[in-house]
């Protein structure tokens, strides 16, 4: 199956000395510690991956439809290599040649396709040496991005926490075998730059469906399906309020020891960032001023609750929650607002509104 093709994909990458980027919200499809791994492209992903793929002459897209959230400009960088030749393989014929024009495509199993491709390449050049110059380029790209991200994430010791500092702390404390489910929203997207996995099927996300409130219910299912793996659900306070908070009682009643991490910034971050950038900070429905203490609420339901508002508390709280073997909620108090929110999902999607009736003139963006 496509999910079991890691050995073949790794063999192909190593034979070609080809850098590997993860598609959007699939941070678990290639080992992050591999010399050729560059991280995820797409919204709030890895600049190393984006800077690398934009130099490509050929892109081999395996088991991905190359959706728009994974190929549109990010960090003010247009990185998708429009002039590169594209080879695409997927079992679903409907995604082939859909979002990006493929020069060659194959409707087939990625594992079988990749194995046969490597076999044919080895017959043509059995002793192909590794490209040391390319390995050095990949290493430099990753080191540069790591330094940028560290500077971005380590600048604040404040309480409440800068969200990027918070994301760095909790992702560093993740157990190696952890399964992480992520929701949609500004904070949930920001962690795409931080989540790293060495195994497959460790990152479960809402993908392009955008179904807010996804992560906690998905985590319950993951824990039932993989009871020996630590399972962490990450949500913002808006998404958690949709479904997560109510389902803590389910986790307690059914003894499903999932850890929920709630980034509480008292706002719908994605919507607020659009209103900051496109509506001159005229806010409608963007604020959540009356959130309860989700840690205390979890304890009232019979779960363990942790409230953290300083970076030094985060790692210990997550480690204690995982070790407890009980349903847990970590209520993380983070900063919100225009100084810390990530860029909008789509800078090209909104234009300033035009009002044609005088009675609505007072609503015009300034």
Give, region by region, the residue ranges found by the protein language model.
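Phosphate/pyrophosphate-binding active-site segments
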Residues: 83-184, 311, 320, 326-366
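Conserved thiamine diphosphate
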Residues: 55-56, 95, 103-104, 113, ...
